[in-house]
């Protein structure tokens, strides 16, 4: 009985592997628009697709980032300045993309731009601390998608949205996890709606990788800022030891993160170039073998694990 079951599982995986290896034809004629290309996943993906001969339209936040990217790629790659929090910037970038793709449409949209913002207890936050992250990671992503999706539909192309394993498990307070849960929900509804037009939507859920999002200096500085802005009553409840423990954890975060960003960009590339892309990609061994399985556990077990492994407030019961 068990041997038959194992054989069926093995056969299924072989068939899936064979099916997923089939590549889309005429990649050199396909346009891909990527946000957040100054550094990290977006920067590496832009260079990766450029090497494959695709027509990369890379959106950067700064001119410096755009210049550095152009210096490392072929003349095929083009850059545009885009701030996903500003409607006028999105409108201008969309028009720029439309002028380049013409009647062929846009084969791929990769929503990669994102920030970590302030991470910490929700009680320490104000509305702006959370809204500033949602503006980039969620609302900006949605507006870019709504603006460019007619071009993607014309090409019967792909939308690739970068979520996170933090869209499956809420590790901490603040806007980051909220935004990534939102990316998951928006992508699920978008995938079903666009399936009628031959458009495929994929979600990439990276684990912990060494990028600007996991920069320990930035995260600990933002955490200290939260501590300084909260009331004396709240500081008394949490205590200095809690602050020190959390700062130590954040300062060492990037050292514990995976440096091989290609584990993520390979998933993005597959979603754009495979005839049969996956709906979801878990990128990184921590995501595949720890955080994703953990997300399927009963809630009380997940809560208990976080309770026993997280810093404790001074006035905790």
Curated annotation (Swiss-Prot):
The gene is Rdh16. Substrate binds at residue 164. It is an enzyme of class 1 (oxidoreductase). This is Retinol dehydrogenase 16. Homodimer. Coiled coil: none annotated. It is a single-pass membrane protein. It catalyses: all-trans-retinol--[retinol-binding protein] + NAD(+) = all-trans-retinal--[retinol-binding protein] + NADH + H(+); all-trans-retinol + NAD(+) = all-trans-retinal + NADH + H(+); 13-cis-retinol + NAD(+) = 13-cis-retinal + NADH + H(+); 11-cis-retinol + NAD(+) = 11-cis-retinal + NADH + H(+). Disulfide bonds: none annotated. Pathway: Cofactor metabolism; retinol metabolism. Liver > kidney > brain > lung > testis. Its EC number is 1.1.1.105, 1.1.1.209, 1.1.1.315, 1.1.1.53. It is found in: Microsome membrane; Endoplasmic reticulum membrane. NAD(+) binds at residues 33-57. GO terms for cellular component: endoplasmic reticulum membrane; intracellular membrane-bounded organelle; organelle membrane. One of its GO terms (biological process) is steroid metabolic process. SUPFAM superfamilies: NAD(P)-binding Rossmann-fold domains. The C-terminal region plays a crucial role in controlling the activity of RDH16 and its required for endoplasmic reticulum (ER) retention. The lineage of its organism: Eukaryota, Metazoa, Chordata, Craniata, Vertebrata. Keywords: Endoplasmic reticulum, Lipid metabolism, Membrane, Microsome, NAD, Oxidoreductase, Steroid metabolism, Transmembrane, Transmembrane helix. Belongs to the short-chain dehydrogenases/reductases (SDR) family.
């Amino acid at each position: 009985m068990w041997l038959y079951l194992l054989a069926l599982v093995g056969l299924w995986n072989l068939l899936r592997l064979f099916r997923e290896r089939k590549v889309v034809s005429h990649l050199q004629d396909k346009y891909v628009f990527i946000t957040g290309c100054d550094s990290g996943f977006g920067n590496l993906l832009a260079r990766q697709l450029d090497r494959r001969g695709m027509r990369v339209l890379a959106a950067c936040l700064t001119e410096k980032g755009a210049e550095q990217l152009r210096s490392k790629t072929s003349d095929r790659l083009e850059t545009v300045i885009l701030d996903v929090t500003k409607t006028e910037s999105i409108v201008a970038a969309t028009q720029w993309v439309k002028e380049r793709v013409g009647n062929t449409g846009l084969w791929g949209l990769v929503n990669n731009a994102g920030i970590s913002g302030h991470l910490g207890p929700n009680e320490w936050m104000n509305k702006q601390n959370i809204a500033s992250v949602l503006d980039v990671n969620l609302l900006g992503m949605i507006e870019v998608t709504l603006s460019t999706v007619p071009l993607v539909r014309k090409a019967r192309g792909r939308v690739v949205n970068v979520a996170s394993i933090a869209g499956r498990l809420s590790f901490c307070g603040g806007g980051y996890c909220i935004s990534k849960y939102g990316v998951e929900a928006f992508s699920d509804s978008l995938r079903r709606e666009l399936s009628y037009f031959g458009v495929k939507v994929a979600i990439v859920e990276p684990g912990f990788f060494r990028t600007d999002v996991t920069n320990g200096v930035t995260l600990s500085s933002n955490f200290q800022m939260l501590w300084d802005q909260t009331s004396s009553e709240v500081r008394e409840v949490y205590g200095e030891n809690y602050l020190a423990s959390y700062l130590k954890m954040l300062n060492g975060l990037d050292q514990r993160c995976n440096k091989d960003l290609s584990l993520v960009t390979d998933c993005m590339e597959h979603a754009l170039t495979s005839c049969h892309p996956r709906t979801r990609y878990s990128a990184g061994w921590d995501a595949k073998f720890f955080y994703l399985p953990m997300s399927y556990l009963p809630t009380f077990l997940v809560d208990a694990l976080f309770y026993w492994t997280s810093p404790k407030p001074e006035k905790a019961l």
